[in-house]
Amino acid sequence: MRSSEDREDSELLPANRPRSPSRSSYDSDDSGLSVDSILEEQKYNAATNETLGLPQEMRYHDEEGGEAGSNEALHTKASSSRSRRLLWLVVLLCCGGWVVAFVLFITQGRADYRTATDELQSDNSGSFSDGTSSGKPLTLQQVLSGVFLPRGHAISWVAGPDGEDGLLIERGEDDEAGYLRINDIRQDGKVNRVLMQKPTVGVDGRTIKPSATRPSPDLKKVLIISNQEKNWRHSFTASYWIFDVETQTAEPLDPNNIDGRVQLALWSPKSDAIAFVRDNNLYLRKLSSERVVPITKDGGEQLFYGVPDWVYEEEVFSGNSVTWWSEDGSQIAFIRTNESAVPEFPVQYFLSRPSGKKPQPGLENYPEVREIKYPKAGAPNPFVNLQFYDVEQGEVFSVDTPDDFDDDDRLIIEVIWAAKGKVLVRTTNRESDILKVFLVDTESRESKLIRIQDISELDGGWVEPTQSVRFIPADPDKGRPFDGYLDTVVHEGYDHLAYFTPLDNPEPIMLTSGEWEVVDAPTAVDLTRGLVYFIATKEAPTERHLYRVRLDGSDLTPLTDTSQPGYYSVSFSDGAGYALLSYQGPSIPWQSIISTEGEKTTTLRIIEDNTDLSKLVAQYALPTENYQNITIDGFTLQVVERRPPHFNPARKYPVLFHLYGGPGSQTVDRRFNVDFQSYVAASLGYIVVTVDGRGTGFIGRAARCIIRGNIGHYEAIDQIATAKNWAQKPYVDESRMAIWGWSYGGFMTLKTLEQDAGETFQYGMAVAPVTDWRFYDSVYTERYMHTPQHNPTGYDNTSISDMAALHNNVRFLVIHGASDDNVHIQNTLTLIDKLDLASVQNYDVHFYPDSDHSIFFHNAHTMVYERLASWLVNAFNGEWHRTANPVPDESMLRRLAKRVWPGFAH
């Protein structure tokens, strides 16, 4: 804890005890953060007292000097005159003393009154990354408007009709080059062919403007998507059109239902058909005919075919498709989802009508209610089954998997077509700690359990529902006598890349190993040369570099510069001979197209260098970032500290902790980023600290899995321990420490405040928090907590329930979107009820109508961050100390009368 000599000019109070309301705000040890707040205070005082800078006890003369009961009967005229002269002398002395004290106050290292425009001494003693010590102040509006976001290009690679590698799709408004065109990297990016000449196309008197395009594999047709309407996070409905490249004309996907809203459409690998979903039913349109064939007929509100329901879209596939064509186009695999047993949760919309339907006359003033099939922890899950459709026979069929989990205990997390009608299917139990891999043969209609792993016995952890398995076909001439597949497995406590061959072999060839992890591996495979490309954290958990390794596990080679900190992502061409390499930080991001055909990569073209961003950054004063480690209970955790541009180690700075902290997540990394935390550090002048505690990703399974069954506990310990470490630093004001987060970070904010009980953190800001994990969806929650039926004590412990502990904080803020379909408002309302029952009042709450989890409706996103910033300023200014336990302010004259007449009451 900080010693008293740090602040000898003011009274030291416990961080969890509000100041007496009788004390003046001028001698509060938490007053005065910024010039703006001082000016606002002065405006208020001018309006109420008509005098600035005087102690409140000295201001009553201008307002109440002649008020009845002001003691004039006790004094003669002469004594009154002497008293006035004496009083003015006291006033002048007080004013002078106050001014001197104020000057000393702001020159002795207090960070309260600093704003971005103040000239502070620059610290040149350290070497920190990406800071600029001079320049214009960063504004919140600039951060929110995205002016500091790097420009980036998402390349859509496409395989040529004859197997050509290095082709990519470009779309633009250049009529001369063509609106949608194929460029050939092998020919220096020259246009290989034009698919759409113009950015619009006419169909039966309608002008169609594409919002997205999907060329067929043979590049003779283009699927045009228009009139998109968002459904959930990844899903949408739209109008679909088939565009013919040769004639430059288009027709509806379903000529007999032009206005039907389509949820998904996928090309056959042979380019001769399109599978699509409408109203939760799966259809097939062969291009040889205008006829649309229904594959399923009973889809609707309870049954989904080919598209996921809410929970599978959100928590398993992170996308809008559960439909897969076989490589030869002869079969379609798809998931049937039965939601009939899943309870509904109502989401209300008071200002908007997401359904697009107008209410009946007289019902305009009632909210629209959207009933969502949402399985909460412990509630019935949707039943999922894998089905197949034989295109030639027109038959839907299933293949029994006798060793699979029961319907109410099964999650299908990945489906991969292999060769000759074989399919790899990965499933887990409901609690996601037992993995089963099946090999399904659609020709013999038999299945085989080829791999099973009990992760709970291995390390007490869980299986993440990733979709990264890659089929490797046999090629004896290339040293691959059997089919196989690549998968990420747990190996010696870390996630590593494994090669299983033949398909039914449960013992893999390990391609990587060590105290580091592969990330969504493999990224690409060069089947000709037998090379696997992947991104990994081999250099540091906060970095991402590109590597390659041979299929026998030899010759692991970095392909990016590992001598410098770096964070890279990559997008490969179909044959893995070319790639879009994206450098994302810590310096200004850039993108280049590289060739991987030699022993070393070759840069073919820089497609983005973000020169404008580099010039913009040079004009602004941005925070420095200090990356370091902290060891807690034997675990090494990653920390980044953002310091104000003019950091002065002789000053005392407030500290804001920012976190997300969800299982497997990462917030501390080396990407370039100018965000809300940057604004807080650069323009509000606070230090911002982020620590990825236990439970987060890329630091090994032991640190990640320790949280299972009791999420929030160890994560809070790590936040508190790190905060205590920072509180001891000579440049930190330990009496002004706050923490904030959104979603899981909102939960962690409240859990940390609850566990800390005001000892370290005084303030917190929680946006869209989970407050009881029984309220969140089953697939996510049970992966980390088991079911409530199996772990009732764990759920009790993780809920925000200790109101006395929250009361010990100075104040906290809770924000929630009223129409959040992800983290329901039920969470915050339940917390408020607990606070009410415990008579806890030291909090603020703000709801945003019709906003979902991202809080965007009607300017809400800007308002959220403005609210967070202003609330934080008030916190570190000491406003929440001064507003605690408010009492009516009696007149100065009445207080003077009480001093003169101790018995005065009225």
From Swiss-Prot:
Subcellular location: Vacuole membrane
Gene3D superfamilies: alpha/beta hydrolase, Dipeptidylpeptidase IV, N-terminal domain
Top enzyme class: hydrolase
Coiled coil: none
Tagged with keyword Glycoprotein: yes
Topology with respect to the bilayer: Single-pass type II membrane protein
Positions annotated as glycosylated: 338, 629, 797
Active site residues according to the UniProt entry: 743 (charge relay system), 820 (charge relay system), 853 (charge relay system)
Keywords assigned by UniProt, alphabetized: Aminopeptidase, Glycoprotein, Hydrolase, Membrane, Protease, Serine protease, Signal-anchor, Transmembrane, Transmembrane helix, Vacuole
Biased composition (Acidic residues): 1-11
InterPro entries, A to Z: AB_hydrolase_fold, Peptidase_S9_cat, Peptidase_S9B_N, Serine_Prot_S9B/DPPIV
Residues in compartment: Cytoplasmic: 1-85
Vacuolar side: 107-906
EC number: 3.4.14.5
One GO-annotated biological process of the protein: proteolysis
Region of interest: Disordered: 1-33
GO CC terms: fungal-type vacuole membrane; plasma membrane
Biased composition range(s): Low complexity: 21-33
Main location as per UniProt: membrane
Membrane-spanning segments: 86-106
Superkingdom as given in the UniProt entry: Eukaryota
Reactions catalysed, as given in the entry: Release of an N-terminal dipeptide, Xaa-Yaa-|-Zaa-, from a polypeptide, preferentially when Yaa is Pro, provided Zaa is neither Pro nor hydroxyproline
MF terms (GO), sorted A to Z: aminopeptidase activity; dipeptidyl-peptidase activity; serine-type peptidase activity
Family of the protein in this entry: Belongs to the peptidase S9B family.
Role of this protein: Type IV dipeptidyl-peptidase which removes N-terminal dipeptides sequentially from polypeptides having unsubstituted N-termini provided that the penultimate residue is proline.
Protein name: Probable dipeptidyl-aminopeptidase B
Organism: Emericella nidulans (strain FGSC A4 / ATCC 38163 / CBS 112.46 / NRRL 194 / M139) (Aspergillus nidulans)
Gene name of the record: dapB
